[in-house]
Amino acid sequence: MSSSLQELCRKKLPDCILPEFFDDYVLQLLGLHWQDHGSLQRIEKNQILVQQEPIHINEALKVAASEGNYEIVELLLSWEADPRYAVVGALESKYYDLVHKYYGQVKDCHDILPLIQNPETFEKCHELNSTCSLKCLFKHAVMNDMLPILEKYTDYLDRWEYCSQMLFELACRKKKYEMVVWIEGVLCVGKVTSLFTIAISNRDLQLYSLGYSIILEKMYSCRQDPTFLLNHFLRDVSIKGLLPFVLKTIEYGGSKEIAITLAKKYQHKHILKYFETWES
């Protein structure tokens, strides 16, 4: 079969119901047979049938690339599959010729990283951009919940306090709470209280509460009095009128009297009303 006729069939036939008498040989001639998988048919923009079983086109592309099946990869890309999945699949199976061929259609490795679950593949993908640094890798590891990357470089990071502090604050801003706990507990973070500033700025009550859980446990274990710390941030959230944060601070031992005094001073009626109702 001529290549032009085969190309026409690959484009037009998949949108139709394939005749039952099309055996594997005919489908191979048409370019619509995937070795070890079966017939291929496009049914929607993002869905195909593989041997009559529905599968997302991008998942199929990832599998085809992981098998090094150039023809099927090309076919699925012609059906508008996302080339990022070709890069991921090829990286996982170390088909680097395919990686470099299709990476050019993506251009930025950081657009691929969110699709990757395996830390080794994640790091290999990041290396596709030769201008990126380890600090960049660590930042994207935080943003994509790739803790094994940080664990691999723990000794390196532990000697780099500036980077550890930056990653800690990034995890706070991105609401990566497990990362926050791990970084604070394992690496050298010089200013843990920056967590509260970020939590208040972003109105992130969960992070705010997490901060107290982390810091107070350490202070109590060292027999330190947390009153100054609690009332320092209580003043901040009271002045801003952030009732949920006020209540959370009082829950951990902050002074209710300070909150009421500042609510009166800054005329935060909703805070005053809450305490009046609470006391009555």
Curated annotation (Swiss-Prot):
Keyword Cell wall biogenesis/degradation in record: no
General function of this protein: Plays a role in virus cell tropism, and may be required for efficient virus replication in macrophages.
Organism phylogeny: Viruses, Varidnaviria, Bamfordvirae, Nucleocytoviricota, Pokkesviricetes
Annotated protein name in UniProt: Protein MGF 505-3R
Organism: African swine fever virus (isolate Tick/South Africa/Pretoriuskop Pr4/1996)
Family under the similarity heading: Belongs to the asfivirus MGF 505 family.
Annotated TM spans: none
Pfam assignment, any one: DUF249
Domain of life: Viruses
